[in-house]
Amino acid sequence: MKSQWHGTCDLRLFKSSRSNNKDVVKTIHQAKCTAPLKVMRVFNDKKDGRCEIPILHSAGGIVGGDQLTINVNAEEDSIAICSSVAAQKVYGSRGRSKLNPQGSWANQKCFFQIKKNSDFEWIPQELIVYQGGLFEQNMTVNLDLSSSFLCVDLVRLGRTAAEEQLGNGVWRSSLEIFRDNNQGKHYEFSDRLELSGEALKSIHGLEQKPVFGSLTWITPKKIKQKDLSDLLVECREQRAGLEGFMTCSLLENGISARYTGSSTQSARFWFYRIWSLTRILRKLSMPEYMRIWPMQENPSRDKKCPS
């Protein structure tokens, strides 16, 4: 008897033609979902009119064979942030046996279409892959030259508190970002990763650390390289006082940051500070912790964090 989920979430984001405040044009949304994915209450009460979208996985966890598809169409001049309601869990693969030693994979596919002058931020909460879990995510982004895209991945491999490691599990990720120019669509950025086996132990991999995180920001074309270089210096300074190994580098039009260590909190704090700096660079409102995020945390308390 099959028990896999095939959940979908289709989102359309567009600026509202009506607003009580003439100085703020709000972004509103349309959503269509199938179980186990569900869009919870959406807020667009930010000072800049940004739409805050929480997505819930109502089944409480992912198992082998589950397939999730998220489609986002961000229309012109829309600004939004999407996150998950809680940390997501990927349980050990179902179907492992002598006849099927590879087990069954869980898969999540995201397709983001970000149109002219839009700003889209994809910042889900932590993903926890249990021992033996098999999870693959594929993200494809089509980004206009005038638009901005920021995404964060934060994954814990094994339940560390229970002294559990990933074992024969695998976490696999693919991120492809395209842009259109006069010659047609071209690659802006591509990043493929697989964490399993020897990569979990090697000094060139995770070196036995259970937490991996990445932040990617692709800027509007109008951002100058000098500003990006200055941003890189500031991002590195924001590592002070945090636990783990953190690296940050320039892309042709953006930045890429990676975290390896034992603390998801340190990773969150560092990524929050980088996120704040990307807003400051564009003279946008400072990011606020979403209502669904851990409220006991406040990375801005650090004197080195922008305020």
From Swiss-Prot:
Keywords attached to this entry: Chaperone, Cytoplasm, Nickel insertion
Localization, UniProt: Cytoplasm
One Pfam match: UreD
Main location as per UniProt: cytoplasm
Domain of life: Bacteria
Record-level Gene Ontology MF annotations: nickel cation binding
Cellular component annotations (GO), alphabetically ordered: cytoplasm
InterPro entries per record: UreD (IPR002669)
Similarity field: Belongs to the UreD family.
Assembly behavior: UreD, UreF and UreG form a complex that acts as a GTP-hydrolysis-dependent molecular chaperone, activating the urease apoprotein by helping to assemble the nickel containing metallocenter of UreC. The UreE protein probably delivers the nickel.
Function as written in the Swiss-Prot or TrEMBL entry: Required for maturation of urease via the functional incorporation of the urease nickel metallocenter.
Protein name, as recorded: Urease accessory protein UreD
Gene of this entry: ureD
